[in-house]
Amino acid sequence: MAKQLKLTWTKSFIGCPETQRATIKSLGFKKLQQSLIKEDCPQIRGQISKVQHLLMVEEL
């Protein structure tokens, strides 16, 4: 696996359940189209899997 992941929040969470909104916020996103670099670990991968339809993920 890659050591880091580049996450980009690409789609709005309007109409999504509150749990998915909380997951986006817990990943550290504040604005749409924001990109973050996160360490690749099972916890982050689990969060990504819950909101994969809202994110674009690249391995670095």
From Swiss-Prot:
The keyword Ribosomal protein applies. CDD domains: Ribosomal_L30. SUPFAM superfamilies: Ribosomal protein L30p/L7e. Keywords: Ribonucleoprotein, Ribosomal protein. GO terms for molecular function: structural constituent of ribosome. GO terms for biological process: translation. One of its GO terms (cellular component) is cytosolic large ribosomal subunit. The keyword Ribosomal protein applies. Belongs to the universal ribosomal protein uL30 family. PANTHER family: LARGE RIBOSOMAL SUBUNIT PROTEIN UL30M, MITOCHONDRIAL RIBOSOMAL PROTEIN L30. Part of the 50S ribosomal subunit. This is Large ribosomal subunit protein uL30. It comes from Syntrophomonas wolfei subsp. wolfei (strain DSM 2245B / Goettingen). The lineage of its organism: Bacteria, Bacillati, Bacillota, Clostridia, Eubacteriales. The gene is rpmD.
